[in-house]
Amino acid sequence: MTEHVFEATVNGKPFTIKTGRLAKQAAGAALVQYGETIVLVTVAAATEPKEDADFLPLSVEYQEKIYSAGRIPGNYFRREIGRPSEKETLTCRLTDRPIRPLFPAGYTFETQVITTVLSMDRENDPDVLSIVGASAALTISDLPFDGPLAAVRVGRLNGTLVANPTNTELDDCDINIVVAGSRSGVVMVEGGSNVVSEAEMLEAIFFGHNALLPLIDIQDQMRNACGKPKRVIVPPEKDTELETRIAELVGDAVAQAVTEPEKDARKSALSKVRENLFQGLGEAFADRKREIKGLFSDLVKKVCRDIVLNQGRRIDGRAFDEVRPISCEVGVLPRTHGSALFTRGETQVLGVMTLGSGHDEQRVETLFGDETRPFMLHYNFPPFCVGEVKRVMGPSRRDIGHGNLAHRGISYVLPDKETFDYTIRLVSEVLESNGSSSMGTVCSCILALMDGGVPIKAPVSGIAMGLVADGDKVAVLSDILGDEDHFGDMDFKVTGTEKGITALQMDIKIKSLSREILEKALHQAKDGRIHILGKMLEALSHYRDDISPYAPKIYIVKIHPDKIREIIGPGGKVIRELQAMSNTRIEVDDSGTVKIAASTEEEARIAIKAVEDIGRVPEPGEIYEGEVVRITDFGAFIQIKNGTDGLCHISELEHHHVKSVTDVVKMGDKVRVKVLEVSPEGKIRLSRKALLPAPEKGEEDEKSAPRSRRPGGNSDRRNNR
């Protein structure tokens, strides 16, 4: 098969998609390259539809091969094993979300999209290549797909918007978002920003949409050049007579049930209406329960949308821009370092903050290199929060994605390491959920930080926006319920301070969004954020002056860089002993800065004194009790503190003449000595005799008397001359 090559230009660099040479047995395959980053994206699908499937059976996988960055995996087996990394999970979601709405209703063939990172240049992130490759592979495959779409990353560097900035440039960008779109408009947005206005964010989003259009052009060229004929999908026909009869039987009851203000009451009322429907239809429809359930769900969705679009109200009675009642509490857990309970309507989230030292930083192996992360946020969504019974397992893709969104929204307001040198872990425990638990996570975790005395730059709140649209009728909803998310057309989450946006995430179920709708949603979200922020600040208006008494205290000691080796000791022996002795955590960096994390002042005092004793250069006149560690003919080397030895010359051992060093001291002896001199090179001269009492005159003369001479010695001969 002939290889086809298609090329566009993004930010002055070639963006290439190739097909026809690799993975030819897949339904579609695209090799995507930008810079020296290359990904292979494949799509495969079952030949028969999945029986009784009432959902889209699509799975998306993203695999980072460590060899792509010229490295060998650091685990015991030296191969890629185990569950996907956090980065892989997030990129799976990023790839899945824009393509999922573009499959037709009634498509039930099991479908799998796999992205494999083959080459990584550490400057161009593979995530946007994965989205483009997935669209390209689906576009040329035989699968029905209402694409193509494309994606770019948008950064703002020194006030200038840039498409697909490099990883190095992103460090200096105050906007970092991924924009996915079709030719007609924006489909998905995900990213963060360093407190920018709604107008600036809107400009960045549509700058990204313009930048991705050339990538859609080359996919159209691919489809024309090598696209396969599409499968014909015939969705199951609706029984319109049955649909009408269901509406006649329970339409009014559904309209009444969905307007129950509380989630459980609404769910219970709809369940009763559905049971009444089965009874009303009778035994003649007993074998069509699955079909009836589907038609009933369609009716509920239709009624809910009608209430919003034609009656101008929401199913729980709120106005379109109204936020549910909010309550906030701080300091709810006495022994944690910071805690807060945030409740908005029937969504309740407990935020807990823990402080640690540099030892507690998360260490991660990525294609960009090994990283340490001093800030972590973990989101937990137990089944009881929605009244369900499920097996409790590790974090799901959804949990990781929601936690990452909250992490991004908060990270921009955290203090830098120079101001607050702690590792921070936030945990979100969702206790109740009826929409927007990720935004509840942001609010509860910010309050937990403030309760724990973390000097954040500004408080952050978050809100989830929804959309119901039908032709010219459009309703933008603030603080959506779970049901509004289900029957609506958009889920748009925005976090920010009073002054601007810190993170956003948008997914839609329709083909695209116009600029006008996005602008309205952003400004309505700002009003909601400010309202929520006001309620939060009523609970705690400013971060506390002091951290929790149960949190570790960080103390800084400076030593000369030459002393680092002595602090650490051979194989880390000395620093381990210091930590065990003082019950502290001690870190030393290359500049000679020693950080001591202690739970009490007494533990800190012990560690500080020990470090200072090792790190300080002895001065003449100081007295130490040391240990003899080496003996030579000319003296004894005495260790006066960890890693520091000095020489006590044989002449400095006693006031009288010493024939052999071992006549006075032996290996391991404890000896009190005085520092006589410290040379510029750091060599230390010690004296033992300086601390001994001066001998009596006669005793000194006796011990110092000359040794007896042999008869006939030289002295006599000299005298006889």
Curated annotation (Swiss-Prot):
Keyword hit for Transmembrane: no
Names of the cofactor(s): Mg(2+)
Coiled coil ranges: none
Record region (Disordered): 687-721
InterPro entries for the chain: ExoRNase_PH_dom1 (IPR001247), ExoRNase_PH_dom2 (IPR015847), ExoRNase_PH_dom2_sf (IPR036345), KH_dom (IPR004087), KH_dom_type_1 (IPR004088), KH_dom_type_1_sf (IPR036612), NA-bd_OB-fold (IPR012340), PNPase (IPR012162)
Residue span(s) of domain KH: 552-611
Subcellular location: Cytoplasm
Record-stated family: Belongs to the polyribonucleotide nucleotidyltransferase family.
Main function: Involved in mRNA degradation. Catalyzes the phosphorolysis of single-stranded polyribonucleotides processively in the 3'- to 5'-direction.
Protein name per the record: Polyribonucleotide nucleotidyltransferase
Gene: pnp
